[in-house]
Curated annotation (Swiss-Prot):
Molecular function as annotated in GO: ATP binding; metal ion binding; NAD binding; NAD+ kinase activity
The UniProt record lists the keyword Membrane: no
Cellular-component GO terms for this entry: cytoplasm
EC id: 2.7.1.23
Entry's transmembrane regions: none
Keyword Nucleotidyltransferase: no
Organism: Prochlorococcus marinus subsp. pastoris (strain CCMP1986 / NIES-2087 / MED4)
Cofactor(s) this protein requires: a divalent metal cation
Protein name: NAD kinase 1
Length: 299
């Protein structure tokens, strides 16, 4: 097994030492590495391994899980994550399973399910006049891709055209645009006023950021769709592409992006004894609904 723990977190580091010791006491081979391993070259770590681990245990928040999941995009390795030093922790199991060592018995007895989370793939194309179409870069994301201005000193209006399945759908004017998976609907998209989508629903959320038109609303589409994003700035300003909170590259006026679903989903282990998705929303978002749900969960 491989243990990836959140960098710059003493709590996560200590938890990784505890986890490593727990595994070795049961004669389970394991190794610890930081999430910022070798200057954020986590992908290269797996590429250079002689033998891949059977399981990756992630200790941190959702950001650490996203980084680990993106590094594993080409490998069929499940992820078991615990919320150690993170904030919301939508993608993680409760840390009690780790510290009371019950996670070992749960794994041995197979008292868990594999939760398949669909990912996003983005190809960035150069479409300069009189040049052959070519891919400049390719990226994968578990939560989302989004497009925002390159400018840091001012906040200009961006103009972004969107096509769905070869059909021009809209031109958004505003601060930017988010394309999220169902998993990512509780991340940046939710903060920008987008809908919460259950992770079992195979969908994309297209959500404009602070649009200048009241008619520009978030929409949910099947994740079998092909989404094309074009920069149509009249002022020659450039837009930056982001994935899962990390900068990718600058999208120039004649460039465009094709976004679709990744063939291989992310495998995440969910314990049978874990709280439900809806209880997670109540706890993480501090919903003030029927308090009996919280009371029943505590009994």
């Amino acid at each position: 097994m491989l243990i990836i723990y959140r960098s710059n977190s003493l709590t996560a580091k200590e938890a990784s030492i505890f986890c490593n010791k727990t595994l070795k006491e049961r004669n389970i081979k394991s190794k610890r590495i930081e999430s910022d391993f070798d200057n954020n070259q986590l992908e290269n770590y797996f590429y250079n391994l002689a033998a891949l681990p059977d399981l990756v245990i992630v200790l941190g928040g959702d950001g650490t899980v996203l980084k680990s999941a993106n590094a594993l995009v080409n490998y069929d390795i499940p992820i078991l994550s615990f919320n150690i030093g993170g904030n919301l922790g939508f993608l993680t199991q409760e840390k009690d399973f780790l510290f009371d060592q019950s996670f070992i018995k749960i794994l041995e007895k197979e008292e868990f399910i594999i939760d398949f989370r669909n990912r996003l793939h983005c190809d960035v194309y150069s479409n300069e006049k009189n040049r052959e179409r070519k891919i400049l870069k390719s990226y994968d994301a578990l939560n989302d891709f989004y497009f925002k201005s390159v400018e840091e000193d001012i906040s200009p209006t961006n103009q972004i055209q969107i096509e769905i399945d070869n059909e021009k759908v809209n031109e958004y004017k505003g601060d930017g645009l988010i394309i999220s998976s169902s998993t990512g609907s509780t991340a940046y998209s939710m903060a920008a006023g987008g809908p919460i989508v259950h992770p079992s629903i195979n969908a994309f959320v297209i959500n404009p950021i602070c649009p200048m038109s009241l008619a520009s609303r978030p929409i949910i589409i099947p994740d079998t769709s092909k989404v094309v994003i074009r920069v149509v700035q009249k002022n020659k300003r450039e837009i930056k592409l982001w994935k899962d909170g990390s900068k990718c590259m600058t999208i120039k006026e004649n460039d465009y992006c094709e976004i679709n679903k990744v063939t291989k989903p992310c495998k995440m282990i969910k314990f049978n004894k874990s709280i439900s998705y809806y209880i997670t929303l109540i706890k993480k978002l501090d919903w003030k609904g029927d308090l009996s749900l919280k009371n029943n969960q505590n009994n």
